[in-house]
Regions:
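Short, acidic/polar
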Residues: 28-36
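Mobile beta-alpha loop/short-helix "lid" or hinge segments that flank ligand
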Residues: 8-9, 50-52
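Single conserved hydrophobic/aromatic residue that forms the stacking wall/gate
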Residues: 1-7, 11-12
């Protein structure tokens, strides 16, 4: 499996947020995500769709994914059209966001638009973070209407029931 993403370097650079509002910074991130997907086809699953929220000033305070629903839809439709999946990453729980990345709205919208390829990750860069909060994933996905998750073998998706 190859995961595409907008690098975390963009989000955490000291100067990224200088001279821009939280809304501008978040929108620029989503625009960069869309540009990456338009240009690159060398991945199977796109991760970190709303990763920017983790590094935004005051994280989720005064943030609503619905403010970005149009560009989120563009991103999801393009991924689906190109046969790409998304990752449900539980690191949001580890970092105090209280939701996975992307949050439930995006997972549900991906499913509503016809997306089927969905992997589960945890940003387990340390052994103790491997599969972090995976016990929460089935209920989250089921609440979004999703009944399957995806694993890959030789870059071929295999759907498994929750």
């Amino acid at each position: 499996i190859l995961i595409g993403l907008v690098g975390s370097e963009m989000c955490i650079r000291d100067r990224y947020w200088e001279g821009k509002s939280k809304q501008q910074g978040i929108m620029e991130y989503y625009e960069a995500t869309l540009a990456n997907i338009r240009k690159l086809d060398c991945f199977d699953v796109y991760g970190h769709i709303d990763y920017i929220v983790r590094y935004a000033p005051n994280q989720r305070e005064n943030y609503s994914i619905l403010d970005y629903k149009d560009i989120i839809d563009e991103i999801l439709k393009l991924l689906i059209q190109n046969g790409k999946g998304i990752e449900c990453n539980t690191a949001g729980f580890k970092y105090g966001l209280g939701v996975p990345n992307p949050e439930n709205y995006v997972l549900k919208r991906y499913h509503e638009l016809g997306g089927e390829i969905l992997t589960i990750g945890s940003d387990g860069h340390k052994p103790e973070h491997t599969a972090y909060a995976f016990d929460k994933v089935p209920a989250i996905l089921e609440s979004c209407g999703i009944r399957y998750y995806t694993v890959f073998h030789d870059r071929k998706p295999i759907m498994l029931p929750l």
